[in-house]
């Protein structure tokens, strides 16, 4: 998660005061600590910290600032905004703006250090035997080739991105679903958009 230097200073000051004194500082004390004379400016920074989930405030109480990650003293993991693709425009780069439906804030470690990644939301149950369920978001590293048996995202003749297991065979390509009730997709040509390297699932 990216925050400004001033917001980081404010966050660290609040955290140290809570740890040392057992209660948070006042807005005036925060301003004095980080060199801000205007209380409204301090309030603005606090609002942004709250919006990023780092603190929680009670507007009815002057000192009610709760640090949300104080329990484990762990740093908030960096977040990267990963494009979620939908319908793919032929001839365009996979992450071209025409293909992107939205951006998803993913903890950086889940991208496995890769920078050229995108996500695809799974629609249907074609990959359930591989543990990929309807509504899951697969994390995909962009690449144009694959080894037999790898799970890839490929482009169909209808310009839809589909997640299947890849096989290159004698005179065709086979995109194999991981669902015994479904038939494979057989193609003379295939455009591989990337290899699946991870999975994100919302637990409701």
Swiss-Prot record:
GO molecular function: DNA binding; serine-type endopeptidase activity
InterPro entries: ArsR-like_HTH (IPR011991), LexA (IPR006200), LexA-like (IPR039418), LexA/Signal_pep-like_sf (IPR036286), LexA_DNA-bd_dom (IPR006199), LexA_repressor (IPR050077), Peptidase_S24_LexA (IPR006197), Peptidase_S24_S26A/B/C (IPR015927)
Catalytic activity: Hydrolysis of Ala-|-Gly bond in repressor LexA
EC supergroup of this enzyme: hydrolase
Top-level taxonomic group: Bacteria
EC nos: 3.4.21.88
CDD domains: HTH_ARSR, S24_LexA-like
DNA-binding region: 27-47
Coiled-coil annotated residue ranges, if any: none
GO biological process terms held by the UniProt record: DNA repair; DNA replication; negative regulation of DNA-templated transcription; proteolysis; SOS response
Site (Cleavage): 90-91
Keywords associated with the record: Autocatalytic cleavage, DNA damage, DNA repair, DNA replication, DNA-binding, Hydrolase, Repressor, SOS response, Transcription, Transcription regulation
Gene3D superfamilies attached to this UniProt entry: Umud Fragment, subunit A (2.10.109.10), Winged helix-like DNA-binding domain superfamily/Winged helix DNA-binding domain (1.10.10.10)
Active-site residues, as the UniProt record annotates them: 126 (for autocatalytic cleavage activity), 164 (for autocatalytic cleavage activity)
Family from the record: Belongs to the peptidase S24 family.
Biological role stated in the UniProt entry: Represses a number of genes involved in the response to DNA damage (SOS response), including recA and lexA. In the presence of single-stranded DNA, RecA interacts with LexA causing an autocatalytic cleavage which disrupts the DNA-binding part of LexA, leading to derepression of the SOS regulon and eventually DNA repair.
Subunit structure: Homodimer.
Protein name as catalogued: LexA repressor
Gene field: lexA
